[in-house]
């Protein structure tokens, strides 16, 4: 079912509540990476260019105490947004109450305000975690501040919070529209097409430490993928399931039987490393060597090896749809980063394919290589994109009105 999009709405003179994802790394008031702020710009600009009054809501980090409040204010985000928009942005140091209401009442068409961190509602109240547990009264209150609601926060789409599901539910109950922003629309389009209607050959690349994090993705994508390439720590659970020696490598002993079942179900679709970069300990400075698919007892696998890279490249060269989630090794250490970087290069070399990257380390690799412009879509949601690839319904998308 097609969702209502911000561009379907008449925004002139309207108070537009926008749930954005401004959950950016901040230390001592300094933003480490403003990508999520930049990703929200198309929706914000569209609203103000069409005469709407943009009222922005976001969480930032996990708020457990008053001390966290000092570190996790959205004030630096509002200042950065003002620089990016090249116009004043008003920051309101509350997200409920008289100051919020008076500031909104004074807004003119095209104005932008940022309310304080929604998760400040998770402490100092009788309900408990009002935001994270979706207190309906909080959702109703926020909904009362606006004429329309736009959800543009894919990063929290897998969570049912007051600031997404709560507002949307109250809006629809009041006969007001709840629409998707352009970022959410883009995520739905790219991930939805990949999961539901991929152009073949469709190759899934999965990495990261744990099989348990990706079980749902593998099960959902076995029937849809032509190949599933597996690297990272999770590969050693699969290699153990095949009877290979894995030395001191990270693996999940309680998931070996499950890995056997997945291998049986997938047939030859699952492709595992044929060689590995192994070291005596988990350290960049440890002696390391390339070994085959059996790892010596005193060593651990920390990256895919050069033959595996070539095998993966050979499969990828014919792909028309590629989804990549998770690193191929201990990417944070230069000596074990090459497998991840090579997979990134292979994706960048594809000319006529839809390429989608999700997950922090895969995204970081794309940025390190400078290949982001060559990738069709880099997802802004870690957990949300995994849930989508599992075929789960995401509350933050389900709550948006259908067209």
UniProtKB/Swiss-Prot annotation:
GO-annotated biological processes: gluconeogenesis; glycolytic process
Cellular compartment(s): Cytoplasm
GO cellular component labels: cytosol
A single MF term (Gene Ontology): phosphoglycerate kinase activity
Gene3D superfamilies per the UniProt record, alphabetical: Phosphoglycerate kinase, N-terminal domain (3.40.50.1260)
Protein residues bound to ATP: 214, 301, 332, 359-362
UniProt pathway annotation: Carbohydrate degradation; glycolysis; pyruvate from D-glyceraldehyde 3-phosphate: step 2/5
Origin superkingdom: Bacteria
List of residues binding substrate: 21-23, 36, 59-62, 119, 159
One Pfam match: PGK
Enzyme class: transferase
SUPFAM superfamilies for this protein: Phosphoglycerate kinase (SSF53748)
UniProt subunit comment: Monomer.
Name by which UniProt lists this protein: Phosphoglycerate kinase
Species this chain originates from: Lactobacillus gasseri (strain ATCC 33323 / DSM 20243 / BCRC 14619 / CIP 102991 / JCM 1131 / KCTC 3163 / NCIMB 11718 / NCTC 13722 / AM63)
Gene, per the UniProt record: pgk
């Amino acid at each position: 079912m097609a969702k209502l999009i911000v561009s379907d709405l008449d925004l002139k003179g309207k108070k537009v509540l926008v749930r954005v994802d401004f959950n950016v790394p901040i230390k001592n008031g300094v933003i480490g990476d403003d990508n999520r702020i930049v990703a929200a710009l198309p929706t914000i600009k569209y609203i103000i260019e069409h005469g709407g009054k943009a009222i922005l809501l976001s969480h930032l980090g996990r708020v457990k105490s008053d001390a966290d409040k000092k570190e996790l204010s959205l004030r630096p985000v509002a200042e950065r947004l003002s620089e990016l928009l090249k116009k004043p942005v008003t920051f309101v140091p509350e997200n409920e109450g008289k100051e919020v209401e008076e500031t909104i009442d004074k807004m003119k068409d095209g104005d932008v305000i940022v309310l304080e961190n929604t998760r400040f509602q998770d402490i100092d109240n009788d309900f408990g975690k009002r935001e994270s547990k979706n207190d309906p009264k909080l959702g109703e209150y926020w909904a009362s501040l606006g004429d329309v609601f736009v959800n543009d926060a894919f990063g929290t789409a897998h969570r049912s919070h007051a600031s997404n599901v709560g507002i949307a539910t109250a809006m629809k109950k009041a006969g007001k529209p709840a629409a998707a922003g352009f970022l959410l629309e883009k995520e739905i389009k790219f991930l939805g097409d990949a999961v539901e209607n991929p152009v073949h050959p469709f190759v899934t690349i999965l990495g990261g430490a744990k099989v348990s994090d990706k079980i749902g993705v593998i099960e959902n994508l076995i029937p849809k993928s032509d190949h599933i390439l597996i690297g990272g720590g999770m590969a050693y659970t699969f290699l153990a399931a095949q009877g290979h020696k894995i030395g001191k490598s990270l693996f999940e002993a309680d998931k070996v039987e499950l890995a056997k079942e997945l291998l049986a179900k997938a047939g030859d679709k699952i492709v595992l490393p044929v060689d590995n970069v192994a070291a005596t300990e988990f350290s960049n400075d440890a002696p390391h060597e390339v070994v085959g698919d059996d790892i010596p007892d005193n060593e651990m696998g920390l990256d895919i090896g050069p033959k595996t890279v070539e095998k993966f490249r050979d499969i990828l060269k014919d792909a028309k749809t590629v989804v990549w989630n998770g690193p191929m090794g201990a990417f944070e250490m230069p000596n074990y980063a090459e497998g991840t970087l090579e997979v990134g290069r292979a994706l960048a070399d594809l000319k006529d394919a839809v390429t989608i990257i999700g997950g922090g380390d895969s995204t970081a690799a794309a940025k390190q290589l400078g290949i982001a412009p060559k990738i069709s879509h880099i997802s802004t949601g870690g957990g949300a994109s995994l849930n989508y690839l599992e075929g789960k319904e995401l509350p933050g998308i389900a709550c948006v009105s259908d067209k």
